[in-house]
Amino acid sequence: YLKHYKRPAKKSYKTEKALVIRGEMFPREYFGIMHGYLHLPDVKRVAKQYGVTVNQYLLGVFAWSVYKGYMHSIPHRRPLAVCVPVNLRPYYGSNTTKNFFAVVSAMFRAEREDYTFEEVLAQVAESLKSQITKEHLEEIMAYNVSNEKNKALRATPLFIKNIAMKIIYQMSAKANSGCVTNLGLVKLASPYDAYVESLYATLSMSKNQNLKAAVVSYKDTLVFTFSSAVREVDVQKVFFRKLSEDGIDVSVETNGVYYE
């Protein structure tokens, strides 16, 4: 981050509280896992038909599923905001193995009851397009690094920083309803690749973010993995049903906690 830091941030970023997905909670030490195995070429084909990228399509289906499965098409004063990590390496020609990413939010505001999927997808895709530009990502990075360079903050005792960071984390967590991260296409070296059919990742829970997802593609299989702190699976059902309606073959498995 310091290497590519260019200028102090001109302004801070304002956030608003996002919709919280609530329900019957699992015990603290449990959370539900649901894998959806998809044929990657089919996902690419469908995304192209809608005129969006694979990531935009999956996030659009995620937003649609929350709108139909959780909100039941009812308008809400708070937006659905989905945290989306963005890999910064392609923007700076970096091959670092350290964490090098910025975070944006895919937004959908439910202001009426009759949105079509195409309208939800358009909102989500446009919110991502407006944020995932090198200029905007540089602003985010500059803001974060400028705080690190602030002499007054650097002189602050560690115990005060720890308290402040906890408060800031809780506030930032409230700005998102959940998170969807796409690790992209993963390749394994020979001869190991011959023994692996698919790969997946799971995200742990955060305060006020009770539903998250991780996406991993390997060969011709894309695995979309939900992790959830709530027992209800209405959102997941709508999600995989929509993919199936769009002509994508879906195979689903869980970690079994939904049946206990």
Predicted regions and their residues:
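Flexible, P/S/T/G-rich "lid" or insertion loops adjacent to the active sites of thioester-utilizing
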Residues: 1-52
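Acyl-thioester-dependent acyl-group transfer interface
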Residues: 19, 23, 32-38, 44-46, ...
